[in-house]
Amino acid sequence: MAIRQHVGALFTDLYEVTMAQAYWAERMSGTAVFEIFFRKLPPGRSYIMAAGLADVVEFLEAFRFDEQDLRYLRGLGQFSDEFLRWLAGVRFTGDVWAAPEGTVIFPNEPAVQLIAPIIEAQLVETFVLNQIHLQSVLASKAARVVAAARGRPVVDFGARRAHGTDAACKVARTSYLAGAAGTSNLLAARQYGIPTFGTMAHSFVQAFDSEVAAFEAFARLYPATMLLVDTYDTLRGVDHVIELAKRLGNRFDVRAVRLDSGDLDELSKATRARLDTAGLEQVEIFASSGLDENRIAALLAARCPIDGFGVGTQLVVAQDAPALDMAYKLVAYDGSGRTKFSSGKVIYPGRKQVFRKLEHGVFCGDTLGEHGENLPGDPLLVPIMTNGRRIRQHAPTLDGARDWARQQIDALPPELRSLEDTGYSYPVAVSDRIVGELARLRHADTAEAHPGSNVVGAKAKRP
C-alpha cells in the first residue's frame, strides 16, 4: 500500500490566498473552469507524457487549512479574522476531468481540468501545477530513455542527484510509469510499490584487501547478484569474476556484471568476449555512467552487448528539457468563456475536450473542441473526481498508468517515436465553435476598449 508524505493547503503562493479573500469579499462564488496545458514543445521533445494526477487527487481529497496554517496566515496581517474563520471550513468540492496518466499530449491540449467554486480552484493551483508539471517533464524524459533501450531494462539510479527527496521519489514513480523496470530508491519503492534494484558501490570493493575478496564476500551473501567490475581496472575485474566462478563451481550464481566508467562500447564487447570464452554466457552486462537516451541509442546502434542500463543524473533532472511552458488558466467563470489576448499567450475560451483520431492503430490527429461537442475521434479527458471525491473506476493507479503509457507510445506515428527531430508536427486542429467563441470575445473586448467606435458586440464578463 502506498505511503506518502502529506502536503498541506499552505503549499500555495501568497497571491492565491489574497485573491481568495478578494473573491470572498466580493461574494464571488461562481463555478470556475481552470485548465492545465502547455503552449509549445521544448527542444528535443515530440510529445509530452501526462503524469502527476494521482498525487493531485490525493491532495484535493485531503485539502484543508489546519490551525497552524491559519495561525501563520493571521500573523501576516493581510487577512481578516472573519475570512480566516471561513477559510478554515474550505474543502475541495469540485470536479476533475483529465487525460489519464501516461496519455501523450500536445500543445494547447488540456491535461487536467478543475471545475469548482472559484476560490477552491484558485487555492489549489500551486500544488496541482507543481505536480503535473514536474511529473510530466520527468515521465517524458523517461519515455525517451526507455524507448532508446529497445526493450532492455532501464533502472532509475538517480536519487542522489535529484533536486530534493520529493523529486527523487517522483522520478522513480514517473520512470516506472514510462516503462522503466524499477528503482534503487527504497522510499519510492515502498511508497509506490515499484520493484527495487541494486548492485554495490566502489567503496565496498575498496574496503577489502582485494577485489576478489570483495566479490566473494558479496556473492556469498547475495548469490544471484550483480558485481561492479570497474573499481580498479574493468577487464581485470571481469577476470576476477571469472576466477570467482571457477572457485565456486556450481555454487556460482552471479547474474550480471556492471560497467560504470570508461568506453562502454569497447569495454562491453571485451567483457562479453571474456565471459563467453569462460563459459559464462548467462552472465549479463549492465551499464551505467552518465547515460541518456542518445548515448544508449548510440551504444545499441554499435551492437554493444549490453543487457540493461542504470540511468541517474540525466533522468532525474531532464537536463535537455527541464521545464515546460505549462500554465493553469481560467477558461470559464459562471457559465461564460474567459480568455486573454496577451501577445503569444492567447487562451482558447471555454471548457474543452480533446478528440483523438486513429487509423490502423496509429494516432493521426487531434481536434480541440468544446466540452459537449460531438467530433470525430476518441475523447481524451475523462472524469476523475466528482464533488471532491475520486471516481473509483477512473482513479489513477501506477500499474494502470504504466500499461496505458505503453499503449500510447505504441500508437504514436513513427516520426514521433524517433529520438531524432524528424520535422514532423502532430496535427492538432481547433473546432469552429472554439474559434468562433474566441472571435466573439475578441470583438467584445475591442468594443469595450473603444466605446465610441461603431464596433458592436456583446460585452464580455470580467472575472
From Swiss-Prot:
GO terms for biological process: NAD biosynthetic process; NAD biosynthetic process via the salvage pathway; response to host; response to hypoxia. Gene3D superfamilies: Aldolase class I (3.20.20.70), nicotinate phosphoribosyltransferase (3.20.140.10). Pathway: Cofactor biosynthesis; NAD(+) biosynthesis; nicotinate D-ribonucleotide from nicotinate: step 1/1. InterPro entries: Aldolase_TIM (IPR013785), N/Namide_PRibTrfase (IPR041525), NAPRTase_N (IPR040727), Nic_PRibTrfase-Fam (IPR007229), Nic_PRibTrfase_pncB (IPR006405), Nicotinate_pribotase-like_C (IPR036068). Disruption phenotype: Double mutants lacking both pncB1 and pncB2 show an absence of incorporation of nicotinamide. The keyword Ligase applies. The modification Phosphohistidine is found at H202. Keywords: Ligase, Phosphoprotein, Pyridine nucleotide biosynthesis, Transferase. Transiently phosphorylated on a His residue during the reaction cycle. Phosphorylation strongly increases the affinity for substrates and increases the rate of nicotinate D-ribonucleotide production. Dephosphorylation regenerates the low-affinity form of the enzyme, leading to product release. Its EC number is 6.3.4.21. It catalyses: nicotinate + 5-phospho-alpha-D-ribose 1-diphosphate + ATP + H2O = nicotinate beta-D-ribonucleotide + ADP + phosphate + diphosphate. Induction: A member of the dormancy regulon. Induced in response to reduced oxygen tension (hypoxia), low levels of nitric oxide (NO) and carbon monoxide (CO). It is hoped that this regulon will give insight into the latent, or dormant phase of infection. GO terms for cellular component: cytosol; plasma membrane. Pfam families: NAPRTase, NAPRTase_N. GO terms for molecular function: nicotinamide phosphoribosyltransferase activity; nicotinate phosphoribosyltransferase activity. The keyword Iron does not apply. Belongs to the NAPRTase family. Involved in the Preiss-Handler pathway, which is a recycling route that permits the salvage of free nicotinamide (NM) and nicotinic acid (Na) involved in the NAD biosynthesis. Catalyzes the synthesis of beta-nicotinate D-ribonucleotide from nicotinate and 5-phospho-D-ribose 1-phosphate at the expense of ATP. It is not able to use nicotinamide. PncB2 appears to be responsible for the increased salvage synthesis of NAD during infection of host tissues. PANTHER family: NICOTINATE PHOSPHORIBOSYLTRANSFERASE. This is Nicotinate phosphoribosyltransferase pncB2. The lineage of its organism: Bacteria, Bacillati, Actinomycetota, Actinomycetes, Mycobacteriales.
